[in-house]
From Swiss-Prot:
Region (Disordered): 1-203, 218-380, 459-479, 509-677
Organism: Bombyx mori
Tissue specificity: Expressed at high levels in chilled diapause eggs and to a lesser extent in chilled non-diapause eggs.
Biased composition (Pro residues): 336-370
Induction: By cold.
Name of the protein in question: BAG domain-containing protein Samui
Length: 677
């Protein structure tokens, strides 16, 4: 996280040491003015006080000029000012210069700090690496965390556009720039714990104010004691709270060159990224800082001297252990190049090292890219192989498929095949012929599978449509056959029904009926031989007809027996009435009728034998009916005997009895009576 740093106390410079512009604008300018124009010098003695009063409230607006800068940073070394001017300094000047530990931070100008803001990030970020190099290489000049080699900066850096004249001055003067002043506070806080080194060092610590913290962030691992003397522990005042506001103000301006409006408008998005930690290096690659960083690394090896701008963009980085090892390896040879006596140059090496730290993460990021490309180059082939295996598995299902397009199985297979097609479409060939050929073959295979599946579904649909047609045809044929069968059975019934009255019309007709009966079933059996139903119907009909015939024969026999009994009873009565003539008269007709009776009885016997042979199948019905008829006959016989005892004429009596039964019996009775008479 990057935040501006307010310096507690700028160093006092004696002789050659001082800010690059102090020689011209600072001590040299005052001395010349005092020598040439003493009256103007007296007038100028009061100007800094007025400037300080006027400019202090506006210093927060980053619009302070050099007048306020000199008063705020106390950049006028008293050694360079003639003593006559010191005597005439205003009282508030004396207070300000005497209490350097208290107020210099409140008077920090904006114009020099803006370029400083660009240097702080890399300086603070690289401190652990340089401190470790101090301990390893034991070259204290180059292990400073705040050393900045400003000769490495390219004109592409926006911070250099406004400071061309300063770069020329820095070529000749030691780098006692705001970089050094900002670093002062941070180093002063650690001077007590550090060993003695060069007392003339200009290195200063930079207290970095982080949001959410009350104290500035200080890298305690940095050992800068070799570069500082013990004569300056008094310059370590605690940072006053108003600096937090100024830090927050500068936090928006950290990334860009001095113009405050430009820094405010474009600095905020980068400050957000800096506050997140090690991200600034990755996110600043698109900006000219990286361009000058890459161009700066070769210049670092060529010109280790502080010949360029002192203001460098430095993204503050609190977590830099990952970037340290490559930076150490790269910077260790470079740190040995500049000679040790150049203590002021100790501030300048780090900025080119900050760009050198930026390429290592890039190098770390570039090797994973070919790693990702290698599996990606293998991915298309593996994907095509997996798709082909799936298609082969689906092909077996397609071959076994027998349903229609409405079946779920068909929908499933079609969906899976189309998904595999889509997968093949998403595969990139990357201009490789083998991948193209494999994809084409896989697509052709899937298309064939889909065609086979559709063909099978269509064929099964046609088969299912054909089957209902065949079934309807068969049903129609069966229905026509059934109609024919019904008609045949009805015709058979109509032909058989008139045969029954013929059988009922006398004994002679009974013979004809019996002779016709065996023929009729034969014809009936011959006419409808098509199905078994007709045969069964014929068998049933034959059984019913035989049963009816047996009943009729039994009735006829019973009637004949009754007629014979009546005739026998009538004959003695006639004999008693007519004498002998009646028996004689009765005998011849009896003799005449006997042969007929015998014939008829013989025919009846044959009929009975034939009928008994046929109705053996229906013995149950015959027995039941015989029993019932015997019961009916028993009262008839008893009534007839009663009537005979009463000597009544019995001939008309059996007629009504027979009328209750069948008409055929009455006719038979008449015939028998005529024959008996």
């Amino acid at each position: 996280m990057e935040s501006p740093v307010v310096l507690d106390k700028p160093p006092e410079y004696h002789g050659d040491r001082g800010f690059p512009f102090e020689e011209e604008e600072g001590s040299g300018a005052w001395s010349e003015l005092a020598a040439r124009h003493p009256d103007i010098a007296a007038r100028l003695r009061q100007r800094p006080a007025t400037w300080a009063r006027k400019r202090r409230p506006s210093s927060n607006d980053a619009t302070d000029d050099f007048g306020d800068n000199f008063s705020g940073f106390d950049r006028f070394p008293f050694d360079d000012i003639p003593p006559e001017f010191r005597e005439h300094f205003p009282s508030h000047w004396n207070r300000r210069f005497s209490s350097r530990d208290e107020q210099p931070q409140q008077q920090t100008p904006a114009s020099p700090t803006q370029p400083q803001q660009q240097t702080t990030a890399t300086q603070t970020e690289q401190t652990p690496t340089h401190s470790e190099h101090e301990q390893q290489t034991q070259i204290p000049q180059y292990g400073l965390r705040n050393t900045v080699d400003l000769g490495q900066k390219s004109p592409a850096d926006p911070s250099l556009v406004d400071a061309d004249d300063r770069t020329h001055r820095s070529m000749s003067a030691p780098p006692d720039t705001p970089n050094q002043t900002k670093m002062s506070v941070h180093n002063h806080q650690e001077q007590t714990h550090q060993p003695h080194g060069e007392t003339q060092s200009n290195v200063r610590h930079i207290p970095i104010f982080v949001e959410g913290r009350d104290k500035p962030v200080i890298n305690k691992s940095v050992d800068h004691g070799t570069h500082f003397g013990e004569a300056k522990p008094q310059y370590v005042p605690p940072p006053p709270p108003p600096h937090v506001d100024r830090d927050q103000y500068f936090a928006d301006d950290v990334n860009f060159h001095p113009p405050p409006n430009f820094s405010r408008s474009f600095g905020t998005p980068f400050n957000k990224t800096y506050r997140q930690g090690p991200q600034p290096f990755v996110q600043q690659k698109a900006y000219p800082q990286t361009a000058f960083a890459r161009g700066a690394s070769p210049q670092r090896s060529q010109s280790p001297k502080p010949t360029d701008e002192h203001f460098v963009k430095v993204p503050v980085h609190h977590e830099t252990p990952k970037a340290e090892p490559p930076s150490r390896a790269q910077k260790s040879p470079q740190q040995h190049q500049p000679p040790p006596p150049k203590s002021p140059q100790q501030h300048q090496p780090p900025p080119p090292k900050s760009p050198q730290q930026q390429p290592p993460p890039q190098r770390e990021q570039t090797p994973p890219q070919p790693k990702t490309q290698q599996p990606s180059s293998n991915d298309p082939i593996t994907q095509i192989l997996s798709i082909q295996t799936d298609v082969l598995n689906l092909m077996t299902d397609v071959e076994n498929f027998t349903g229609t397009k409405k079946d779920k199985r068909y929908l499933f297979l079609d969906e899976m095949l189309t998904r595999n097609l889509i997968k093949l479409d998403n595969i990139e060939t990357d201009g490789k012929e083998n991948i193209r050929q494999a994809r084409k073959e896989a697509i052709k295979c899937i298309q064939k599978c889909i065609a086979v599946l559709e063909a099978k579904a269509d064929s099964s649909n046609q088969q299912r449509k054909a089957q209902p047609e065949q079934e309807t045809q068969v049903q129609d044929e069966c229905q026509s056959h059934d109609v024919d069968m019904k008609e045949n059975t009805q015709n058979d019934q109509t032909t058989e029904i008139p045969a029954q009255p013929i059988v009922e019309n006398g004994e002679v007709e009974m013979d004809e009926a019996t002779k016709e009966k065996p023929a009729e079933p034969q014809t009936a059996a011959a006419v409808p031989p098509q199905t078994d139903n007709t045969e069964e119907a014929n068998v049933e009909k034959q059984a019913v007809e035989s049963a009816v015939a047996v009943e009729k024969d039994e009735k006829q026999e019973v009637v004949k027996v009754e007629a014979q009994e009546k005739s026998e009873e009538v004959k003695p009565e006639d004999a008693n009435a007519s004498g002998t003539v009646n028996p004689a008269e009765t005998q011849p007709p009896a003799a005449d009728t006997r042969p007929e009776d015998n014939k008829s009885t013989g025919g009846d016997a044959e009929k009975k034998e034939d009928k008994k042979s046929t109705p053996k199948k229906v013995t149950k019905t015959v027995k039941k009916r015989d029993k019932s008829k015997d019961k009916k006959d028993a009262p008839k016989d008893s009534n007839k005997e009663d009537k005979i005892e009463a000597n009544s004429v019995l001939n008309p009596e059996p007629m009504p009895v027979d009328e209750k039964g069948d008409k055929t019996d009455s006719q038979v009775m008449d015939v028998d009576g005529a024959a008996s008479q």
